[in-house]
């Protein structure tokens, strides 16, 4: 299962979090966010990382040109679109950056939003479902209605986000079977400053789950 830790701002934390077990790191490319980092800061953070770690930039309502330039300047391997981007826009990003994973984040508060998510699947590589908040795009600490997602079976891989923590991750995964999970505020001391003890605890919980599955419990 993919494990993405989002909102990285410190290069030394990116290396530590990857070594703890993260398969993907997320970098916020939205200037209004308290977790915002520049292309240069992203490059400093991703340069020492192993090649197999996905480096994903999070954008919201940016232009194709801005996204393209940031990817080229920073060394990102993925682009997460977290604003009001249309399926057609997602397709344009994928065409302009064919070697880069395109993720579309959708803030879900009803079954209608889930139906909308299906429309995106043929234009992107991966879906990300986040909790709805009227003012904030992500990192809100709010959880999704997991029960609503139990029958969600998109045709592309999907990540579960929204208020996940080391304390509730096993409960979430007992109800749902996403291809990956995405955590931000649930493993932070403050925005952009990750709590490495919480990250370590997250992976302890995930490893205990894998052990139980492997032992048939």
UniProtKB/Swiss-Prot annotation:
Gene3D superfamilies linked: Aldolase class I
Any single GO BP term: L-tryptophan biosynthetic process
Name of the gene encoding the protein in the UniProt record: trpF
Name under which the protein is recorded: N-(5'-phosphoribosyl)anthranilate isomerase
Disulfide-bond pairs as recorded: none
Chain ranges passing through the membrane: none
Source organism: Nostoc sp. (strain PCC 7120 / SAG 25.82 / UTEX 2576)
EC number of the protein: 5.3.1.24
Coiled-coil segments on the chain, per record: none
Superkingdom classification of source: Bacteria
Reactions catalysed according to its record: N-(5-phospho-beta-D-ribosyl)anthranilate = 1-(2-carboxyphenylamino)-1-deoxy-D-ribulose 5-phosphate
Listed GO MF terms: phosphoribosylanthranilate isomerase activity
Keywords from the named record: Amino-acid biosynthesis, Aromatic amino acid biosynthesis, Isomerase, Tryptophan biosynthesis
Record's keyword annotation contains Amino-acid biosynthesis: yes
């Amino acid at each position: 299962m993919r494990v993405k830790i989002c909102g990285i701002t410190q290069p030394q934390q990116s290396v530590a979090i990857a070594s703890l077990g993260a398969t993907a790191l997320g970098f916020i490319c939205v200037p209004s966010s308290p977790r915002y980092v520049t292309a240069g800061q992203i490059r400093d953070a991703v340069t020492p990382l192993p090649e197999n770690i996905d480096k994903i930039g999070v954008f919201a309502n940016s232009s194709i040109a801005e996204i393209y330039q940031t990817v080229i300047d920073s060394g990102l391997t993925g682009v997460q679109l977290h604003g009001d981007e249309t399926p057609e826009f997602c397709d344009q990003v994928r065409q302009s950056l064919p070697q880069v994973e395109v993720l579309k984040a959708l803030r879900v508060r009803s079954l209608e939003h889930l139906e909308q998510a299906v429309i995106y699947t043929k234009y992107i590589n991966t879906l990300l479902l986040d909790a709805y908040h009227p003012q904030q795009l992500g990192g809100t600490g709010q959880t999704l209605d997991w029960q609503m997602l139990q029958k969600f079976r998109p045709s592309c891989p999907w990540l579960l986000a929204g208020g996940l923590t080391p304390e509730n991750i096993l409960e979430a995964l007992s109800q749902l079977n996403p291809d990956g999970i995405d955590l931000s505020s649930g493993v932070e001391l403050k925005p952009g400053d990750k709590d490495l003890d919480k990250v370590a605890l997250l992976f302890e919980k995930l490893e205990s789950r894998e052990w139980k599955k492997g032992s048939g419990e």
